[in-house]
UniProtKB/Swiss-Prot annotation:
The gene is tal. It is found in: Cytoplasm. The keyword Electron transport does not apply. This is Transaldolase. Its EC number is 2.2.1.2. It comes from Burkholderia cenocepacia (strain ATCC BAA-245 / DSM 16553 / LMG 16656 / NCTC 13227 / J2315 / CF5610) (Burkholderia cepacia (strain J2315)). The keyword Cytoplasm applies.
Length: 317
């Protein structure tokens, strides 16, 4: 029988969300995504410690920031040996509110990849979907540097990314689900509030519909999944980035996967575009408590993991 993973691949580009690249071969994803937390997790495993140690050894007298950039490239180049498509490499979350430094970091990462023999067409630079991050993406895209906009929790963020010409967005599903489930407390009913009614699933569906209605070329890649149900509800989304644990569950399942999203069967189409000037963006984002809280939390978590990675590096000097 055809596995759920193979069925999903008929409708959606499957992406692996991991720094643990030794797991990639068995799932045959097209692309891969990484973030500071995944890289931190990977370098603490015995299989990947040699990459960290070699990178530190080769650049012992350089700044920690310099070494982290080389570590990200080391992981990215290894991942690209195992997949046919693109890898996403994330800009330090501590630059989330600094447009110029985000631009500089994006350019530097691309330069390092190209020096390692990797063309920029295989790289996506990940930036937080803050106003400043979106402005950085707008500049980088015009230079032929493709961007993946992450920590995206709202339609206004998605609309701003599309207007800026971002290559791809990563609207989060699981973290939205977490927020609403926590808010509901004892009133949460998984049978009623999950599946197609999952607030994270509904958010991605709304963004997908908005993009297809107005003809935006920006790719939609659902991210941050908690369950295979969330993934299956978004079959047909342009791309879905999935952790190895959930890829394995899909591979072991023979459940039927039907296409849920298609440009040809859009429902609840929006009547007009979202206003995207800076004041409107900031007000609309502020007006949505979940998106505001989850964006702030996500930046804090990624920034904290960057600091932990710095400490690991400094301990090896």
């Amino acid at each position: 029988m055809t596995t759920a993973l193979d069925q999903l691949k008929q409708y959606t580009t499957v992406v692996a969300d991991t720094g643990d690249f030794q797991q990639l071969a068995q799932y045959k994803p097209q692309d891969a995504t990484t973030n500071p937390s995944l890289i931190l997790k990977a370098v603490q495993k015995d299989a990947y410690k040699p990459i960290l140690e070699k990178t530190v050894r080769d650049h012992r007298n350089e700044s920690t920031d310099f070494i982290i950039d080389r570590l990200l490239i080391a992981f990215g180049t290894e991942i690209l040996k195992l997949i046919p498509g693109r890898v996403s490499t994330e800009v330090d979350a501590r630059l989330s509110f600094d447009t110029q430094r985000s631009i500089d970091k994006g350019r530097e990462l691309i330069k390092l990849y190209e020096a390692a023999g990797v063309g920029r067409e295989r790289i996506l630079i990940k930036l937080a979907s803050t106003w400043e991050g979106i402005r950085a993406a707008e500049v980088l895209q015009k230079e032929g540097i493709k961007c993946n906009m992450t920590l995206l929790f709202s339609l206004v963020q998605a609309a701003a990314c599309a207007e800026a010409g971002a290559q791809l967005i990563s609207p989060f599903v699981g973290r939205i689900y977490d927020w609403y489930k926590k808010q509901a407390g004892a009133d949460w009913n998984e049978a009623r509030d999950g599946g197609a009614n999952d607030p994270g699933v509904q958010s991605v569906r709304r963004i997908y519909t908005y993009y297809k209605t107005f003809g935006y070329k920006t790719e939609v890649m659902g991210a941050s999944f908690r369950t295979t149900s969330q993934i299956i509800e978004l079959a047909g989304c342009d791309l879905l980035t999935i952790s190895p644990d959930l890829l394995q569950k899909l591979q072991e399942s023979n459940d039927t996967v039907a296409r849920k999203l298609s440009p040809d069967t859009l429902q609840d189409k929006p009547a007009e575009r979202v206003a995207i000037d800076e004041a409107s963006f900031r007000f609309q984002l502020n007006d949505e408590a979940m998106a505001t809280e989850k964006l702030a939390e996500g930046i804090r978590v990624f920034a904290a993991d960057a600091v932990k990675l710095e400490k690991l590096i400094d301990a090896l000097r």
